[in-house]
Each structure stands twice: as C-alpha cells, then as structure tokens.
Amino acid sequence: LLVRGARPLAGAATRLSPRGLSTTNKLVLTLSAGSSSIKFGVFDVAGGAPVERCSGIVEEVGSDHSRLKLVVDGEVKRDVADLHIKGHGEALANIRDALAPQLPGEIAAVGHRVVHGGASILGPALVDDAIVDEVDACAALAPLHNPANALGIRFARDTWGDVPHVVVTTCVEINILRR
C-alpha cells in the first residue's frame, strides 16, 4: 500500500506494508460511508494477500428501518432490520460493537474510502487532522458522501487511534480518465 504524507503533493511517498503492522493477526478495517449507509470490511493481511474475514453494511441510516448485516468468513452472523439508527455516529458504534466479538485479532490499520479530496488529496494519504479538514472542505464537491466520510474518519480515529489510518479517494479515477 503506497501512502503519501499528510499532504500528498508536498511529501515523498513512504511504504506501509502488512509486514509493518504490529499485531499477530494483522487486520485491516475498511470503511465506506455514504449518505444513508456504511459498508465495512475486515481483511487479514498476515499472509501477504488480503483475505476477507468480515464484511457488512448498515443501511437506511437515519430511518426507523435501519438494518445491520454482518458476514464473518462467508456466514451471516447478524442481520437485524427495523433498527432505529439515528445517524452515522450511531451506525459506526453499531459496527464497532458488532465486529468486536468476531475479530480474530486487533485492528492494525484502517482504510477510508473518500469520494473527493479536492486538489490536495490526489492519492492514498496517511490521515492527520489536515486530511480530515480537507475532506470536510470538499463537502460541496460530494455533498452526499464527504460529510459522512469525514465523520467516519473521526469516529474511527477516536476508536482505533493508535493505528495508521489511510484515505483513498475515488477522484483518482477521474484523474486517470483525464489522461
């Protein structure tokens, strides 16, 4: 995984590899927050190639019909409908609580999909406060996703603050298409 410094345009690239993660079972959590849902996955990277261990979704965030689905090693472990999950913070707390007893190790890194990072986040970037501020600043470019993306990053940093967090922006695809 190639990770650029806090300001990708200004810093040299550094390498963050699964071998550099600090747990026995090297697990990477991925989050993709949208306007009314959050998708998540947990991948074991101890053996090199990522192996999906858990995945799921919280749907209909903000409604009386919210749903949480959790799949562990290909088996549905939890599928609860008609929850009343008021917002993304509550949805992320539900994800954290549902994942905790299922994980075969500790989260060693967190990856965040961000829809638009503006002109400053043009590739994968190690998260710091400036990166989160930039995601917020680009809310007008992706109003249904960036606010939820920033909230997800803040929540995850509060929950798993002692591990690296990386944003990957889909605007990279736009830059590729322009070439």
PLM regions with names:
Residues L1-T24:
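N-terminal mitochondrial targeting presequence
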Residues V28-T30, A109-G111, V167:
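Short glycine-aspartate micro-motif
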Residues L31-S36:
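A short acidic Gly-Thr/Ser loop motif
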Residues S37-I85:
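Short glycine-rich, Thr/Ser-proximal phosphate-binding strand/loop in the N-terminal lobe
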Residues D73-R113:
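Glycine-rich, N-terminal phosphate-binding loop and its surrounding beta-alpha-beta segment
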Residues L99-L144, N175-R179:
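Short beta-strand-loop/turn "lid" adjacent to the catalytic site in phosphate-handling enzymes
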Residues V135-R179:
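Active-site neighborhood for divalent-cation/phosphate handling
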